[in-house]
Curated annotation (Swiss-Prot):
Residues 330-357 have a biased composition (Basic and acidic residues). It comes from Arabidopsis thaliana (Mouse-ear cress). The keyword Lipid metabolism does not apply. The chain crosses the membrane at residues 6-26, 37-57, 70-90, 99-119, 139-159, 183-203, 215-235, 251-271, 279-299, 304-324. Residues 330-374 are annotated as: Disordered. Residues 19-149, 195-323 form the EamA domain. This is WAT1-related protein At1g09380. Residues 363-374 have a biased composition (Polar residues). Residues 325-354 form a coiled coil. Signal peptide: none annotated. InterPro entries: EamA_dom, WAT1-related.
């Protein structure tokens, strides 16, 4: 693998490992008693602090003017991409498991395709193989999500992990006895989070056409998200002790979610997309499911069910169907552009030959002929 291919590959693997760590640490913090809305508020605050120097030093000379229209678009980005997405996701994570949460997150490309088609940012092309793959892949993703949500089945006997530590074991036992989990509400909220996240893609794509400053827009989005999430968390829980970060687990999970899973992840994904495109970045999302499933089994003693395995497999298969269709569509468009380019070149050549054939011919002094300009 060439160096130009190796660096984006390593960056995206690092992002998925970072997201896996966020799911594990956040689940442990919530099992230990941290409220999900408070965790989301701290995540936005830490993400704002971490993103500020990146946006300031990298875009202070190239940043377009921030107009009222841009601020309105950023506000809707914060509602969908920060507040709505993360509040729904973390409450859903509290009421499910990290493995199910990550599996349902793979619905994002399919949901994004549906919304993009509705808002005419994506063409379906049902008569072409690319369009058929996107539609079928979306349907398979939805079926997989339904299996994950409503069918558990039998436990898969893969044995017990020998490396989990007592701290995580005590937390998960305490959490399981507290009755927080709701394996119907949790998946539903995570699917709603995927819809909110997909809506952010639609709004962000529109905004990037006039405001090409991704780090600054992320900074503003996180800042507005901090205010929104902070207000929601204060209304729902204004007990001072619940906001305390004196516990190392609470502080680490909030700091990790903000710095690694928000600020660092966005920078690495933006860098990879500039070099390889968004499709390349999307292909790595199923890796998160594999990493989290291993970590959850090893560290949190999470049991794997046949329904989880079957639903996850369907979601991943459907995801790659959508991505294959998108990649095929890009290839088809490039082929069409190349054909148009060749046709234009052919027409231009024939036109030049026709013009030359129509030029008058004049005799030179030595009896030969030459063309004269009109």
């Amino acid at each position: 693998m060439a160096k130009s291919d190796m660096l984006p590959f390593l960056a995206m693997v690092l992002v998925q490992i970072g997201y896996a760590g966020m799911n594990i640490t956040s689940k442990m913090a919530m099992e230990a008693g941290m409220k999900p809305l408070i965790l989301v508020a701290y995540r936005q605050i830490f993400a704002t602090i971490a993103t500020f120097p990146v946006a300031f030093f990298l875009e202070r000379k190239t940043r377009p003017k921030i107009t009222l229209r841009i601020l309105v678009q950023v506000f809707f980005c914060s509602i969908t991409g920060a507040t709505g997405n993360q509040v729904l996701y973390f409450v859903g994570l509290q009421n499910s498991s990290p493995t199910i949460a990550c599996a349902l997150t793979n619905l994002l490309p399919a949901v994004t395709f549906l919304l993009a088609a509705i808002f005419r940012q994506e063409t379906v092309g049902i008569k072409k193989a690319s369009g058929q793959a996107k539609v079928i892949g979306t349907l398979v993703c939805v079926i997989g999500a339904m299996v994950l949500s409503f069918y558990h089945g039998h436990t898969i006997g893969i044995g017990e992990s020998k490396i989990h530590w007592a701290y995580a074991e005590n937390i998960t036992k305490h959490g399981s006895s507290s009755g927080h989990s709701n394996f119907f509400l949790g998946p539903f909220l995570i699917m709603a989070a995927a819809v909110s996240w997909a809506a952010w893609f639609i709004i962000q794509t529109k905004m990037s056409e006039t405001f090409a400053a991704p780090y600054t827009s992320t900074l503003l989005m996180c800042l507005m998200g901090s205010i929104q999430c902070g207000a929601i968390a204060l209304i729902s829980d204004h007990t001072i002790s619940d906001w305390s970060l004196s516990s190392p687990l609470r502080f680490i999970s909030a700091l990790y979610a903000g710095v690694v899973a928000s600020a660092l992840a966005f920078c690495l994904m933006s860098w990879a997309m500039q070099r390889k495109g968004p499709l390349y970045v999307s292909v790595f999302s199923p890796l998160l499911l594999v990493v989290v499933a291993i970590f959850s089994w090893a560290l949190l003693e999470e049991k794997l069910y046949t329904g989880t395995f079957m639903g996850s497999a369907l979601v991943v298969i459907g995801l790659y169907g959508v991505l294959w269709g998108k990649d095929r569509e890009v290839s088809e468009k490039e082929e069409e552009r190349e054909k148009v380019k060749q046709q234009n070149h052919k027409v231009k050549s024939e036109s030049n030959e026709d013009i030359e054939s129509r030029l008058p011919v004049a005799s030179s002094g030595n009896g030969s002929t030459r063309s004269t300009s009109p």
